[in-house]
Amino acid sequence: ARRRHSMKKKRKSVRRRKTRKNQRKRKNSLGRSFKQHGFLKQPPRFRP
């Protein structure tokens, strides 16, 4: 999305980059929650 009216760029607040370990942990937790909530146990027509 391109800002049309404001020509002045807003500086993003500089944050520390998260490490790969955090990405892996987040991905694993998401997979675990999927399994817990039973998305994989639904009938096949609901599967992506």
From Swiss-Prot:
Region of interest (Disordered), ranges: 1-48
Keyword hit for Nucleus: yes
Key words of the record: Chromosome, Developmental protein, Differentiation, DNA condensation, DNA-binding, Nucleosome core, Nucleus, Spermatogenesis
Protein location: Nucleus; Chromosome
Keyword Nucleus appears in the UniProt entry: yes
GO cellular component terms listed in the entry, alphabetical order: nuclear chromosome; nucleosome; nucleus
Pfam families cross-referenced by the UniProt entry: Protamine_3 (PF08188)
GO annotation, biological process: mitotic chromosome condensation; nucleosome assembly; sperm DNA condensation; spermatogenesis
Composition bias type Basic residues, residue spans: 1-29
Tissues/organs with expression: Testis.
Principal location class: nucleus
GO terms of molecular function: DNA binding
Function: Protamines substitute for histones in the chromatin of sperm during the haploid phase of spermatogenesis. They compact sperm DNA into a highly condensed, stable and inactive complex.
General remark: Two isoforms exist, a major form and a minor form. This is the major form.
This protein's name: Sperm protamine R3 isoform 1
Organism: Hydrolagus colliei
